[in-house]
């Protein structure tokens, strides 16, 4: 272990605080602030680009930032954060995690560069897409530091880093965009601000913390890679399925069409957020009930959560049909004409988002049942379905076709995970009855 001063100094000391005991309330509040700003930034930036740089630029940004750039984030992220923050016994050091993340980040940059080289984009679009890949990969690298903050019981530092990095990069991006109206220039400023934020709020801070081991053991990075390869495939395939309709629209329609689709797709992030708030508080209870064999209680919680999601779905679909397009048009005035024909498409996306919430409920059930291999099988099957169907639906139906295939893919995942969850539930019930008999 490295011996660090107990009382941090300099700029890092301002971020860390005076070294007094960290309260749970402080951790929760800063984590909520950071998470909210991080999630909110995507919507703010998307709206700003459409309004300040135009519909075509909005479509390019939607693809670069929320689709391909985010996909490269997932690849660099490697699905490893849940593993790192729960590794409180330090099977792996921070140096091990950082070493593997540097490799995955480097590979994500190379894939991003290769993609724009063969994409046939104009120089400007290729540069914007690649810059957003760099932006997101830096985000993934910062996540390693922020996971280490959390593992050390300093979740508030994770929240502060998220909050301050987001504010800095968004302010630089919006300031440049407002002054120049050029998305490429704004993207350069955003990447510069992201690098500065990473150095200020992650690198400088972690060097002032005690008990952070930078050394990486021999062969540890490969062992860590092997331990998390299933998580990697899960997050990469999951995001591809989630974004397949966007990829198809980017490939077969105009950039401004993708801007419209990105606008009506925006409510899915709210649905995912609400679903997380509904499901996650019950995960520990579900895990305990499953492990202790209280299957009736387990089934009851699943049923009640499904009913809550169903009720929220009815409200969301009704709201989307009556108010969805008018509200989104207020947020995106430049897209009002394109949005005017998208009421059905919006409702399909809302239904797809609800199906995704059901899918997550069954996904967590399979995780609790320790059936991760079946999760990978489901993702692989539906990924093939996405590759085969997304382009065809978009060519045939445009934005509405994209919305329909999104709903279809979410339904396929939900059914796949739901069937396996029910099957393993019945299998355990039969085993219980056999043991009792």
Feature-to-residue mapping (PLM):
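Transmembrane helical elements of multi-pass membrane transporters/channels
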Residues: 27-46, 164-169, 186-201, 205, ...
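Helix-loop junctions and terminal segments of transmembrane helices
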Residues: 42, 73-92, 151, 269-293, ...
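Membrane-interface junctions at transmembrane-helix termini in multi-pass inner-membrane proteins
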Residues: 21, 25, 80-92, 138-163, ...
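Hydrophobic alpha-helical transmembrane segments
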Residues: 126-133, 159-209, 227, 265, ...
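Interhelical loop/hinge segments that connect adjacent transmembrane helices in multipass membrane
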Residues: 2-24, 156, 160-161, 184-185, ...
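Membrane-water interface segments that mark the loop-to-transmembrane alpha-helix transition
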Residues: 22-38, 70, 74-117, 127-130, ...
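Interfacial segments at transmembrane-helix termini and the short loops linking adjacent helices
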Residues: 53-58, 116-132, 255, 322-354
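Signature of the first transmembrane helix
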Residues: 4-11, 20-78, 109, 170, ...
């Amino acid at each position: 272990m490295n011996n660090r001063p107990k009382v941090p100094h300099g700029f890092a000391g301002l971020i860390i605080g005076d070294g007094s005991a960290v309260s749970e309330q402080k951790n929760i509040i800063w984590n909520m602030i950071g998470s909210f700003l991080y999630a909110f930034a995507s919507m703010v930036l998307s709206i700003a680009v459409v309004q300040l740089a135009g519909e075509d630029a909005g479509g390019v940004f939607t693809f670069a930032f929320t689709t391909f750039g985010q996909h490269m984030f997932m690849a660099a992220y490697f699905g490893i954060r849940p593993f790192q923050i729960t590794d409180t016994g330090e099977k792996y050091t921070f140096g091990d995690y950082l070493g593997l993340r540097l490799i995955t980040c480097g590979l994500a940059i190379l894939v991003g560069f290769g993609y724009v080289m063969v994409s046939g984009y104009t120089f400007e679009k290729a540069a914007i897409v690649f810059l957003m890949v760099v932006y997101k990969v830096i985000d993934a690298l910062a996540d390693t530091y922020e996971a280490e903050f959390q593992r050390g019981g300093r979740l508030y530092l994770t929240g502060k880093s998220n909050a301050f990095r987001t504010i800095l990069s968004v302010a630089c991006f919006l300031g440049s965009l407002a002054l120049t109206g050029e998305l490429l220039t704004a993207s350069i400023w955003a990447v510069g601000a992201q690098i500065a934020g990473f150095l200020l709020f992650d690198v400088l801070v972690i060097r002032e913390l005690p008990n952070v081991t930078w050394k990486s053991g021999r062969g540890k990075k490969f062992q860590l890679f092997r331990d998390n390869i299933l998580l990697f495939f899960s997050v990469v395939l999951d995001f591809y399925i989630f974004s397949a309709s966007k990829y198809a629209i980017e490939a077969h329609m105009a950039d401004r069409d993708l801007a419209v689709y990105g606008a009506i797709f925006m409510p899915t992030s709210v649905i995912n957020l609400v679903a997380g708030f509904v499901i996650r508080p019950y995960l520990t209870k579900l895990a305990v009930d499953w492990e202790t064999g209280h299957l009736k209680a387990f089934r009851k919680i699943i049923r009640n959560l499904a009913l809550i999601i169903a009720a929220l779905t009815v409200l969301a679909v009704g709201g989307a049909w009556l108010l969805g397009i008018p509200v989104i048009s207020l947020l995106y005035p430049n897209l009002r004409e394109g949005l005017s024909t998208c009421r059905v498409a919006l409702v399909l996306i809302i239904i797809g988002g609800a199906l995704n919430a059901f899918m997550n409920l069954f996904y967590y059930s399979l995780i609790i049942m320790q059936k991760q291999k079946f999760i990978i099988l489901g993702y692989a099957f539906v990924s093939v379905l996405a590759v085969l169907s997304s382009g065809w639906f978009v060519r045939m139906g445009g934005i509405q076709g994209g919305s329909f295939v999104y709903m279809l893919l979410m339904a396929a995942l939900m059914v796949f995970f739901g069937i396996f969850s029910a099957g393993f539930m019945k299998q355990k019930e039969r085993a219980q009855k056999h043991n009792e008999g």
